[in-house]
A protein has these predicted regions:
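Peripheral, non-catalytic segments that deliver or gate enzyme domains
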Residues: 1-181
């Protein structure tokens, strides 16, 4: 595959800056670029996967860690935040990153083993969070993006396996021959 895999997104409150997703550090993360033509001198850098990339203009890495951004849902223009979905192993969740200071709304440790998808309101204030876990087939909540707390449960689906004897699902890790991975 060749980057960019995702379209760039200009900040609604500042048309000279845009968000670019890249795996240049080994994980898909968000980068803030300044599109001001006076800052477009470029340099070539080495990426984590052994390739190189050319970078023009000022850049700031907004998200960082051993997890990846899976989807940019949109913006909260009032708080100048980017709302996104991120994945780490079997855990996923929705987050906001402040463009000014790079602060992320909540720690990844708050996320449970689950698969999330979302739809953001036009204002970026509320989010329809759809998710499932190994024990729960579907939950849909209305979430306030200020604190990512549920404000209303819209659906908690009944398990289609109710009344059946089901195996328990367990996850774990196995070390490779090198003993570290």
């Amino acid at each position: 595959y060749v980057e960019p895999q995702n379209a760039i997104a200009f900040l609604p409150w500042d048309p000279t800056k845009f968000i670019y997703q890249s795996q240049r550090d080994g994980y898909n993360h968000l980068y803030l670029f300044d599109a001001d033509a006076t800052n477009m001198k470029g340099e070539t850098y080495n990426s984590a996967n052994g390739g190189t990339y050319f970078q023009a203009g000022k850049v700031k890495q907004l998200t960082k860690g051993n997890w990846l951004v899976s989807d940019v849902l949109g913006f909260n223009t009032k708080r100048k935040e980017i709302i996104f979905t991120a994945v780490e192993g079997l855990r996923s969740g929705h987050f906001a990153v402040n463009v000014s200071n790079g602060k992320i709304s909540q720690p990844f440790e708050n996320c449970k083993e689950s698969e999330h998808s979302g739809m953001l309101s036009a204002s970026g204030t509320y989010l329809i969070d759809r998710y499932s876990t190994k024990d729960q087939p579907r939950i849909i909540n209305l979430v306030d993006t200020k604190n990512f707390k549920e404000t209303a449960n819209l659906l908690t689906a009944e398990s289609p396996y109710e009344g059946y004897q089901m195996p328990s699902i367990e996850t774990g890790t196995i070390k490779a021959a090198d003993g570290t991975t």
